[in-house]
Amino acid sequence: MDNYYFSAKAYTTLVEAMPGKTFTDATALVNWQRGTKSAEELDFMRKAARISEKIIDGLLDRVEPGVPKNEIAASIYSDALRGVDDAWGDYPAIVPLLPSGTDAAAPHLTWDGRSFAEGEVTFFEVSGCYRRYHTPFCRTIFLGTPPDDLKRAEAALVEGLEAGLDAARAGNRAADIANALAAPLERAGIERGARCGYPIGISYPPDWGERTISLRPEDDSILKPGMTFHFMPGLWMDDWGIEITESILIRETGPAETFCHRPRKMFVK
């Protein structure tokens, strides 16, 4: 009974139209059933991943000091909708997120008319979309020379990301990914309280997450082959933020497969 597009009015209309009937709350029932993807769904997600890569490649070429952020947002949409080869692009469920400087201390911020500036960090959270299937992908760009604390955080984050990917195996728990990520961060003196991922697949606005399993220490859900997640260990600190993420597939054996294939690092220009 809890859904973006199932309103209180819709519920009362059903009750009035079907007197004497009992309605059972089946919130998220369908979401749980679609957690394991078919071969065709995975093919769609791999095509979406090629679009995600194209978007990030374009950002690495175009982002420079003095370029207005809205122009970069427009280029993201252009790459997303033009697609790659036979994978035409659809509109993603979430708009491009690209906060810079102190704005990057918080997730989920979009853009304005300001220009990119020397000495600022920007993370880009985007996703290609093919036949409504998504593969979110985040990378971070620093214009200039990054400070030492940001470089130390990058190193710990990448170490945690690699550890989490190795822990993302069939039979392990969602919590195992979160705990693997947390260990290098804790050694670096970084506390991170937020979840670090969620299931993905087919979606419409306003969200590309499936709202079921949550990659956090408290979630003991068992990982199964065919499950797909956005593993997104972002850091949002007092006056900066960094995101280096991967969309992943739980395989029959071995660690997770990443849908996208780009260096796991903060790009410096």
Model feature map: region roles:
Residues M1-K269:
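Active-site neighborhoods and metal-handling regions in enzymes and metal-associated proteins
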